[in-house]
Amino acid sequence: MKPKVLLITAMLFIASTGLSQREKPKLHSDFYFGSYPVLRDGASLLEKADARLLLVGFHQGWTIEKIAKESKVAEPELDRLFADLEEARLASEIDLDERKPMLPVIRDRDIVNVQRSLQMHTQEFTSLLRSNWSEIEAALAPLTGAKDIPSAQLMYQVVVGSILFGGMHDAFFADQTIMVNPPRRMGSQRYYAWLVESDPIRAGILKREQWESDGFTIVSIGKGLPQNRTNLERIRMERGLILEEAEARRLRSFLAIFTRERLLPYFKKNRSGFLNVVNEFDAGKYVSVSSAFAWYYDQMANGVVENLVSAKLIQPPAGHYTYALKVPGPR
């Protein structure tokens, strides 16, 4: 009896695996938006299913007329949505019959193709960061503005909110060899963006948001975006991380040197490998390498955070951590 049960179980597993790996239709709206830096405007626009349909259709090389026919959405409505996407610089018109996304559309098969490389790069980057852990701890130890914060919480805020998200991007943009400054969007906004099929985790769970208030740069880091931004007074009341000018300058200097000298060389050394991976994306025919790598790095960073949390080196917030660094004054 037991062999028969095992055989049935195996057959069910094979059948379910086949179903899970079956490709979805060429046109559907089960896609999720992500970006760096975080921009709420872009996310709001792509909450509309038909806007996502348009970008997926353009990714396939289809016209608005064909997308309307396949989706049963009225063509005038799609034209109106395209105008919104074009204004936000998330889509562009090449000519009357050709439009393209201005962000990579990442499909399930792209994820499958890069999964092994992504796991390898995430583990390597985790190991590199851990090998320099004591240097980060030593830099934070003297900060009086951090004295009331438990070590694992402080390390989360700095490592996740200021190194993996923030510091590494600044290092990439300054170096320009693998990822250049984000493309210009609406008005003065500049950000990388992506649309990922099936799984919101693959669009990036962790969100870093930054703004200025009362002479401070305020940073929020956590899963998703908080509904409302936290002000400086609330951070003070909750005895959060607040660094005045001298300590903020010292931390910024450390972060710039650390990311440039300890972490960036790994990416430069393996540049050809990273380029080979992102060139496998179907989106490579219409977006830059930088745009594809922005998504790939976001996935790496999210994976590194999972590894560090599992190792109990950092403590994630119940919702979000919010901290403040004094804006540099004239010297």
Regions found by a protein language model. Name each.
Residues 10-19:
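Hydrophobic h-region of N-terminal signal peptides that target proteins for export
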Residues 23-52, 159-160:
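Short alpha-helical segments that sit at the start of domains
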Residues 43-69, 199-251, 265:
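Short amphipathic alpha-helical interface segments
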Residues 72-88, 93:
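Short amphipathic alpha-helical interaction segments
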Residues 97-103:
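Minor-groove-contacting beta-hairpin "wing" of winged helix-turn-helix DNA-binding domains
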Residues 103-137, 251-254, 258-266, 270, ...:
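Short, amphipathic alpha-helical interaction segments positioned at domain boundaries
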Residues 115-217:
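Extended alpha-helical scaffolding regions
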Residues 227, 233-331:
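Charge-dense, extended regions
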